[in-house]
C-alpha cells in the first residue's frame, strides 16, 4: 500500500535564491520547493550550473507574473580566461582552440566599446532556445549546428574591472535575452585570442534588493532552528518572501474600489479614475491595496483583466 502523499502548502511570493555553483537551476528550484513544502513553484531566467547568484523562485500565484521578470534587465560579474576557446564558451566545455594573448590596453578598450549600447547577438548553440521544437543544446550535444538568427539586445553598462595575466574581469548590466558566455566568446574573437567564462555571478534581477538573497544553507538552518524551537518552519521561512506582485513592480498601480473590483475579478473591464492612458497596470483593491492581478488599459480607457490572482480557501 502506497504512503499517503503529504499535502503541500499553497503559498504565494518570490524567494531570491543565491544559487550555488555546480547546481542546475532546476535542481535548486526543487530543493527550495521541498524546503518550503510548496505545491507550486518555478524559477525565472535559468542560470548555468557554473554560475552563482540571484535566481528568483516564484511560489503559487506569483508564477503567473514571472514573465515580467524574464523581460527585465540583469547585472552580472564575469571573469574570462583569455587565450582559450571552448565549445560551450565556458569552463564546463572542451577546449577547441588556444592562441597567444597579444592585444594592448588600447585594443581592449576599443573592443569593449563595440559591445556597449544596442547590439545584435547570435545565441550560443549551448542554450535552451528552441529550433523546430528542440532545444539548441540538444543539437549541440549531437554535434549538429543549426542556423540561429541574431537577436537585438542592449548592454546598458559594461565596466572594466581588471586584466591580470590571462584573466579579464567585467561587470555587465544588460537587457533580457543576453548571453554572457556569447559576449565573452565574441570579445575573445575581436581580441584575436579567444576567451571563455570561468566565473559568472548574477548580481541583480530587475530592482530586487541584493541584500534579500538567501542561500540554501541558510534555508536549511532555519528549518533546523524551527525544529529546535518546536514551531512550524513556515514561521521562519515565509518572512523571506517578496510580494507576489514584485515581478511586475515596474508597472504603475491602479487601485479599484471594492464595488468595482468584484467585476474586474469576474473578468470584466471596469472604469476608474487615475488610470494611465495605455499599457499594463498592477491592479489592487480597497483601502489596504491588496493585489488582485494585472490589467491593461483597453481602447475605451477601461482597465481590462489580463492575469488574475486565484484565492484558495484556507
Swiss-Prot record:
<dbReference type="GO" id="GO:0031119">
    <property type="term" value="P:tRNA pseudouridine synthesis"/>
</dbReference>
<dbReference type="InterPro" id="IPR032819">
    <property type="entry name" value="TruB_C"/>
</dbReference>
<dbReference type="InterPro" id="IPR015240">
    <property type="entry name" value="tRNA_sdUridine_synth_fam1_C"/>
</dbReference>
<dbReference type="InterPro" id="IPR002501">
    <property type="entry name" value="PsdUridine_synth_N"/>
</dbReference>
<protein>
    <recommendedName>
        <fullName>tRNA pseudouridine synthase B</fullName>
        <ecNumber>5.4.99.25</ecNumber>
    </recommendedName>
</protein>
<keyword id="KW-0819">tRNA processing</keyword>
<dbReference type="InterPro" id="IPR014780">
    <property type="entry name" value="tRNA_psdUridine_synth_TruB"/>
</dbReference>
<feature type="binding site">
    <location>
        <position position="179"/>
    </location>
    <ligand>
        <name>substrate</name>
    </ligand>
</feature>
<dbReference type="InterPro" id="IPR036974">
    <property type="entry name" value="PUA_sf"/>
</dbReference>
<dbReference type="Pfam" id="PF09157">
    <property type="entry name" value="TruB-C_2"/>
</dbReference>
<dbReference type="Pfam" id="PF01509">
    <property type="entry name" value="TruB_N"/>
</dbReference>
<dbReference type="InterPro" id="IPR015947">
    <property type="entry name" value="PUA-like_sf"/>
</dbReference>
<feature type="active site" description="Nucleophile">
    <location>
        <position position="48"/>
    </location>
</feature>
<feature type="binding site">
    <location>
        <position position="200"/>
    </location>
    <ligand>
        <name>substrate</name>
    </ligand>
</feature>
<dbReference type="InterPro" id="IPR020103">
    <property type="entry name" value="PsdUridine_synth_cat_dom_sf"/>
</dbReference>
<dbReference type="GO" id="GO:1990481">
    <property type="term" value="P:mRNA pseudouridine synthesis"/>
</dbReference>
<dbReference type="GO" id="GO:0160148">
    <property type="term" value="F:tRNA pseudouridine(55) synthase activity"/>
</dbReference>
<keyword id="KW-0413">Isomerase</keyword>
<comment type="similarity">
    <text>Belongs to the pseudouridine synthase TruB family. Type 1 subfamily.</text>
</comment>
<comment type="function">
    <text>Responsible for synthesis of pseudouridine from uracil-55 in the psi GC loop of transfer RNAs.</text>
</comment>
<dbReference type="Pfam" id="PF16198">
    <property type="entry name" value="TruB_C_2"/>
</dbReference>
<feature type="binding site">
    <location>
        <position position="76"/>
    </location>
    <ligand>
        <name>substrate</name>
    </ligand>
</feature>
<dbReference type="GO" id="GO:0003723">
    <property type="term" value="F:RNA binding"/>
</dbReference>
<feature type="binding site">
    <location>
        <position position="43"/>
    </location>
    <ligand>
        <name>substrate</name>
    </ligand>
</feature>
Amino acid at each position: 500500500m502506497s504512503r499517503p502523499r503529504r499535502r503541500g502548502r499553497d503559498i504565494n511570493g518570490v524567494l531570491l535564491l543565491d544559487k550555488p555553483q555546480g547546481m542546475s537551476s532546476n535542481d535548486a528550484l526543487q530543493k527550495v520547493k521541498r524546503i518550503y513544502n510548496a505545491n507550486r513553484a518555478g524559477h525565472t531566467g535559468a542560470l548555468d550550473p557554473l554560475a552563482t547568484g540571484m535566481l528568483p523562485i516564484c511560489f503559487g500565484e506569483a508564477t503567473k507574473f514571472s514573465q515580467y521578470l524574464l523581460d527585465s534587465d540583469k547585472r552580472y560579474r564575469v571573469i574570462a580566461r583569455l587565450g582559450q576557446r571552448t565549445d560551450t564558451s565556458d569552463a564546463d566545455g572542451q577546449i577547441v582552440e588556444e592562441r597567444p594573448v597579444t592585444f594592448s590596453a588600447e585594443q581592449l578598450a576599443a573592443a569593449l566599446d563595440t559591445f556597449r549600447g544596442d547590439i545584435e547577438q547570435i545565441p550560443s548553440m549551448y542554450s535552451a532556445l528552441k529550433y523546430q521544437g528542440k532545444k539548441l543544446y540538444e543539437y549541440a550535444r549531437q554535434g549538429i549546428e543549426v542556423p540561429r538568427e541574431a537577436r537585438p539586445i542592449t548592454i546598458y553598462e559594461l565596466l572594466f574591472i581588471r586584466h591580470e595575466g590571462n584573466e579579464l574581469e567585467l561587470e555587465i548590466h544588460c537587457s533580457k535575452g543576453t548571453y554572457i558566455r556569447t559576449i565573452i566568446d565574441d570579445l575573445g574573437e575581436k581580441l584575436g585570442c579567444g576567451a571563455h567564462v570561468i566565473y559568472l555571478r548574477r548580481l541583480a534581477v530587475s530592482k530586487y534588493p541584493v541584500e534579500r538573497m538567501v542561500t540554501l544553507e541558510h534555508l536549511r538552518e532555519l528549518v533546523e532552528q524551527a525544529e529546535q524551537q518546536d514551531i512550524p518552519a513556515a514561521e521562519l521561512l515565509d518572512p523571506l518572501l517578496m510580494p507576489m506582485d514584485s515581478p511586475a513592480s515596474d508597472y504603475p498601480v491602479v487601485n479599484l474600489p471594492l464595488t468595482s473590483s468584484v467585476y474586474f475579478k469576474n473578468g470584466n473591464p471596469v472604469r476608474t479614475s487615475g488610470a494611465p492612458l495605455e499599457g499594463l497596470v498592477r491592479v489592487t483593491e480597497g483601502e489596504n491595496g491588496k493585489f488582485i492581478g494585472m490589467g491593461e488599459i483597453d481602447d475605451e480607457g477601461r482597465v481590462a483583466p489580463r492575469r488574475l490572482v486565484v484565492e484558495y480557501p484556507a
